[in-house]
């Protein structure tokens, strides 16, 4: 059948509405939803015809596509997914998972009125930042603290407050770009601070900073390169040296440590990552970091440091535009409470627990998952293998964590097709594919995920 005839054969919406099965859906759903879904189905087949992808179709085909489309339109777009990639802080999958304490706190303040900006002791308006400021000070040792909606906002607010229309001196090797084309120079531009690059990509000396200080200098800026490493012939100015230089010229020193860990991971066999506490102990005046990376909390930009600088930031007009909501505050409070005891934090904050849990634990978990799959799913090959997980989230570049995975292949379906079907399933499962095998890394899986994985694998060949 030629293309024109196929297009003429496309059913009209009024015609489809008279179909018994469509009419049944009309009784249970709004007319707008049904009509929109029918239109999408017709448009889909029109597109397939114009692309020469089909040479025939039936009204039943259009109705079946309508049913799938209707169910998709009714479901929420923001979905739970199962992360079997082994990337703990997976940026595309929502970064850090919240601790139980944080989730409970969010539910409590979300389903009730709260004292968001009300001082219960004084009986008058209060500050939303008061709910977490004392906690942040306690776990970091800072003089003062405040929170905005993400770390880019924290950097922008701090720079705007410290050196609007003045110069911020930073090493050329620290002008980083993170995901989504976010670049430190661009944030500095929007903060209205004037960028002064010093040194070279691989080597920057203290004299590079000092030689560029003038009457218009507003801040000495240090940016932790948390998502890449430069190795070999390198030189970097330490925080202590920058603090001494800042003191000599009465200039504030600001450090953006990005991933924002409160735990010294070198104690657990990892490469050292600067902690918030260590930066403050070295005398850095203002430190900015993320809430949803190594901290293991919600998306937030946390600013800690000297009270005189934080107080100025609180009064900055940008602060209101960048402020966080009650649910984020509740989640952050619940997360920070775990940090009062580091052991409790590692046990209860999923991000920390996943990163620091032992290889032996994951070997046993991988064996359990393999047994369940083998006992319930036919026509697939399953084996447990050693592999490497990643921290992710632009944190600990180059760090790989020994883990165990379940590798899957089949003579009846390709690894790429398995990946696609799992990703598009009712319970989306995100996996890795390597050398014609699907890889399920148990480091980022929960026990509750195992049954779902088994059920979705059962459907793959149907």
UniProtKB/Swiss-Prot annotation:
Catalytic reaction list: L-seryl-tRNA(Sec) + selenophosphate + H(+) = L-selenocysteinyl-tRNA(Sec) + phosphate
PANTHER family with a match to the protein in the record: L-SERYL-TRNA(SEC) SELENIUM TRANSFERASE
Protein name: L-seryl-tRNA(Sec) selenium transferase
Coiled-coil regions listed: none
Gene Ontology molecular-function annotations: L-seryl-tRNA(Sec) selenium transferase activity
Needed cofactors: pyridoxal 5'-phosphate
One Pfam family hit: SelA
Location of this chain's protein in the cell: Cytoplasm
Family the UniProt entry places it in: Belongs to the SelA family.
InterPro entries: PyrdxlP-dep_Trfase, PyrdxlP-dep_Trfase_major, SelA-like, SelA_trans, SelA_trans_N_dom
Keywords from the UniProt entry: Cytoplasm, Protein biosynthesis, Pyridoxal phosphate, Selenium, Transferase
Pathway(s) where this gene product acts: Aminoacyl-tRNA biosynthesis; selenocysteinyl-tRNA(Sec) biosynthesis; selenocysteinyl-tRNA(Sec) from L-seryl-tRNA(Sec) (bacterial route): step 1/1
Domain of life: Bacteria
EC number: 2.9.1.1
EC class name: transferase
GO process annotations (BP): conversion of seryl-tRNAsec to selenocys-tRNAsec; selenocysteine incorporation
Entry keyword Cell cycle: no
Cellular component GO terms held in the UniProt record: cytoplasm
Modified residues (N6-(pyridoxal phosphate)lysine): 293
Family matches, as SUPFAM superfamilies: PLP-dependent transferases
Main subcellular location: cytoplasm
Purpose: Converts seryl-tRNA(Sec) to selenocysteinyl-tRNA(Sec) required for selenoprotein biosynthesis.
């Amino acid at each position: 059948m030629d293309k024109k005839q196929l297009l003429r054969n496309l059913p009209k919406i009024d015609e489809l509405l008279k179909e018994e099965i469509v009419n049944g859906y009309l009784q249970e759903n709004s007319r707008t939803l049904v009509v929109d879904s029918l239109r999408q189905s017709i448009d889909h087949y029109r597109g397939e015809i114009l692309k020469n992808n089909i040479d025939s179709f039936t009204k039943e085909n259009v109705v079946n596509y309508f049913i799938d489309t209707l169910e998709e339109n009714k479901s929420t777009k923001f979905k739970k997914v199962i992360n079997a990639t082994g990337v703990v802080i997976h940026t595309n999958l929502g970064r850090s998972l919240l601790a139980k304490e944080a989730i409970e706190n969010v539910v409590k303040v979300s389903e009730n009125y709260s004292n968001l900006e009300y001082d219960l002791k004084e009986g008058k308006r209060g500050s939303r930042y008061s709910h977490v400021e004392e906690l942040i000070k306690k776990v970091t040792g800072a003089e003062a603290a405040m929170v905005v909606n993400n770390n880019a906002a924290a950097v922008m607010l701090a720079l705007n407050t410290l050196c609007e229309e003045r110069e911020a001196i930073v090493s050329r090797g620290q002008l980083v770009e993170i995901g989504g084309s976010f670049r430190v120079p661009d944030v500095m531009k929007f903060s209205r601070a004037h960028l002064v690059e010093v040194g070279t990509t691989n080597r920057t000396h203290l004299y590079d900073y000092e030689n560029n200080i003038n009457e218009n200098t507003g801040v000495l800026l240090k940016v932790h390169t948390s998502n890449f490493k430069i190795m070999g012939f390198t030189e970097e100015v330490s925080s202590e040296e920058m603090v001494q230089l800042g003191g000599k010229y009465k200039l504030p020193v600001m450090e953006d440590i990005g991933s924002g860990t409160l735990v010294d991971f070198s104690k657990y066999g990892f490469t050292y990552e600067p902690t918030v506490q260590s930066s403050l102990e070295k005398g850095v005046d203002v430190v900015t970091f993320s809430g949803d990376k190594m901290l293991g909390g919600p998306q937030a930009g946390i600013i800690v440091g000297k009270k005189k600088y934080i107080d100025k930031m609180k009064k900055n007009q940008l602060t209101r535009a960048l402020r966080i909501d009650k649910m984020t505050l509740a989640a952050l409070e619940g997360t920070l409470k775990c940090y009062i005891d580091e052991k409790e934090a590692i046990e209860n904050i999923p991000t920390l627990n996943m990163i620091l849990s032992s290889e032996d634990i994951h070997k046993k978990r991988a064996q359990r998952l393999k047994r369940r799959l083998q006992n319930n799913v036919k026509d697939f090959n399953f084996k447990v293998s050693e592999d490497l997980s990643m921290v992710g989230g632009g944190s600990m570049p180059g760090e790989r964590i020994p883990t165990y995975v379940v590798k899957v292949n089949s003579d009846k379906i390709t690894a790429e097709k398995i990946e696609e079907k799992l990703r598009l399933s009712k319970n989306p499962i995100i996996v890795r594919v390597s050398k014609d095998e699907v890889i399920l890394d148990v480091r980022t899986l929960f026990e509750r995920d195992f049954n779902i994985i088994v059920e979705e694998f059962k459907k793959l060949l149907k």
